[in-house]
Amino acid sequence: MLRIVLARSSRAMSSASPASASDSDTSVRKIGKALETYLKHSQQHVAMMEKHRAEFETGRRHLAKMMSLDIHELDQEAIDRAILYLFPSGLTDPNARPVMRPPDEILPKFQRFTFDEEGKPEGSRFFTLSPKIYGLLSDIGVKTHSVMKFYDEHVGSRSVNRSDLEPANLSGSQWVTADKLKKKLSEKFSKELYGQVIIAFEHLASLPGSAIEQKFLMEFREPMTASTGSKLFGPAIPEVHVCAVTNRRYAEVTTRCKDTRATVKVTDAGKGKFDIDGLQLHDFRHLQAREILLAPMIVSQSLGRFDVTATTSCISNTLPEAPNKAPLMRSGGMSALPRAVRHGTALCVAALQPEAIEPLRLSGLLTLDPRKNERSKVNQPGARAKWIWKRR
């Protein structure tokens, strides 16, 4: 009987050993392929960076000859001035203008890992596809556990402030987008991983006592007005302030339209009043002017919610005149003044009411009108009009 049991056990061991050996060989092959792929990408990145550095130095020497400068005097500031001089551009977006910078500042950085003497990576997340995003998830989990422990220890004590036992205040901000998080971590990841990160952040922010991790949470959030900065032409959406006397939110911005400059202040929790250079809304006799002033309120569906205070001035009156001429008194015009106030009102309403940013932008109320009156030409009745030509 003992011989039969020993025989069966030996057969089982002999049959299991090849399977375990094959599994270990497969895992070793996978690890070897991962290391081989990493080393291959690392060598390709080093060769590419050396090539681009050599091209940058060659272009730098040619630029120094073109500008008649010594190569040692051509620093980055001189290069920027030379590019601006050689390639004048009227593009309003700075990211669309030509630049000449070292490849280390422009090209994406390669993520490097450290290995020990045996060639094994020191970080355990090396074998994951996204080590940094998994590290961020681990940090969120650790901080979630610490917040829960902190709240359980100090929930009934008076040794800490009550504000520390409340959830984090994240009003006026939103989580960074997937593209910005990829740039921040210098790593690519899937949409599913980004969704898991946002869910983990939301859970951490909703916990009582998460105010102690306010700084960590705000590192991955951005103001709601920051996302529309590159989409707007003209002044950006202003910041929201709180009045120390009335404890009401307000926003203030300065803008222009043609020859009129307007400084607009919009206060929340108001009654829909307008005060433009001491004039009320009913003081504007033209129906067009009233419609222009009320346009931001109609689009944002906030009639009667905000109070608008504006002061206007004519830009031409502030310009120096010739010494032998008397100063000219100009006015901003009947339509330019309401349009300037409308633009400032729309920007302030977008700051105080973030959910109305997209409707205001699609309506064109957040875009500055850069047009100006064309000057009159000599010996012509107007800017473009010509005298009627007669043969005799």
UniProtKB/Swiss-Prot annotation:
Residue intervals passing through the bilayer: none
Superkingdom of source: Eukaryota
InterPro entries, per the entry: Ribosomal_Su5_D2-typ_SF, Ribosomal_uS9, Ribsml_uS5_D2-typ_fold_subgr
Main location per the UniProt record: mitochondrion
Name listed for the protein in its UniProt record: Small ribosomal subunit protein uS9m
Keywords: Mitochondrion, Ribonucleoprotein, Ribosomal protein, Transit peptide
Pfam family name, one: Ribosomal_S9
Organism of origin: Caenorhabditis elegans
Family: Belongs to the universal ribosomal protein uS9 family.
Subcellular localization: Mitochondrion
Name of the gene encoding the protein in the UniProt record: mrps-9
Upper lineage: Eukaryota, Metazoa, Ecdysozoa, Nematoda, Chromadorea
Quaternary structure note: Component of the mitochondrial ribosome small subunit (28S) which comprises a 12S rRNA and about 30 distinct proteins.
Gene Ontology process terms (BP): translation
Gene Ontology MF terms: RNA binding; structural constituent of ribosome
Region ranges (Disordered): 8-27
Assigned GO CC terms: mitochondrial small ribosomal subunit
Low complexity bias: start-end ranges: 8-25
